[in-house]
Amino acid sequence: MSESSNGSGYPKLILENVRAGYDGVAVLFDVNMEVWPGEIVVLCGGNGAGKSTLLKAIMGTVSVFGGEIRYDDQRINRWASHRRTKAGISFSPEGRRVFASLTVKENLHAGASHVPTSQLSERRQDVYEYFPILGRREEQLAGTLSGGEQQMVAIGRALMSRPDLILVEEPSQGLAPVVVDRVYQALQRICVDRNVSVVIAEQFQQLRVNDCDRVLVIDKGTVVPYESLAKT
């Protein structure tokens, strides 16, 4: 991570005093965080801590009751999720959620609804650069893939729109450590090659401090640096 990596020395994403939740009930309280271009930030916490809600607030799929979310120095609180996608934010949800009856290729295309048909092949090749096995299996039904390969499809689908910010929800869930290594290595390469920012939500037991630039902890709806929690 470097402040100069985006030329302007300005964070890609800023959250200031954000409150968000469901059906009028707040789950997040005065959340403050920033993400710089080209860095990986891991957001860790237990079940029900608010990790998923925070990613969805950034993506625009839950209600934001207060505070401000800024992306590329634009206030996006009122933007619909599809507008955020067009602006460069992409989401890989928990549980991978691939379309089991569709091929790998078709699953990837599902992440490229705003991409001209003439560009789909090139976009797929971009994905295969980081996940070569998907290129060899692009005509295979996603439901027949291993859990690790399905996770690669989910992240690849998020890459198809060529985002500047990728939100990844619990990519380690249910995967062997060696597979998790490959997934994180691919995310690191994507950050370096494309100056993409990545925010990963993980459980505490899946925390990989050495594979990211910063760790933030979410507890009872608020976010604190991992280092400050470790000192308490």
Question: Predicted regions: what is each one?
Answer:
Residues M59:
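Helix-to-loop junction immediately C-terminal to a conserved catalytic motif
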Residues C44-G46:
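The feature captures the beta-strand-to-loop junction immediately N-terminal to the Walker
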Residues G67-R75, A87, L120-E122, P225:
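Conserved ABC transporter NBD signature motif
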Residues A158-L159:
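ABC ATPase C-loop
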Residues A201-Q203:
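H-loop/switch region of ABC-family ATPase nucleotide-binding domains
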Residues L141-L145, E149:
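Conserved ABC ATPase signature
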Residues D23, V64, V104-E122, Y130-G135, ...:
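ABC-type ATPase nucleotide-binding domains, specifically the catalytic core motifs of the NBD
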